Swiss-Prot record:
It comes from Xenopus boumbaensis. The keyword Secreted applies. Belongs to the gastrin/cholecystokinin family. Magainin subfamily. Signal peptide: none annotated. This is Magainin-BM2.
Length: 23
């Protein structure tokens, strides 16, 4: 469902932001 897609996108977004913050 849509909520599952949003949840996956949220996890990916957090990981992506984490990588940006590290550098």
């Amino acid at each position: 469902g849509v909520s599952k897609i949003l949840h996956s996108a949220g996890k990916f977004g957090k990981a992506f932001l984490g990588e940006i913050m590290k550098s």
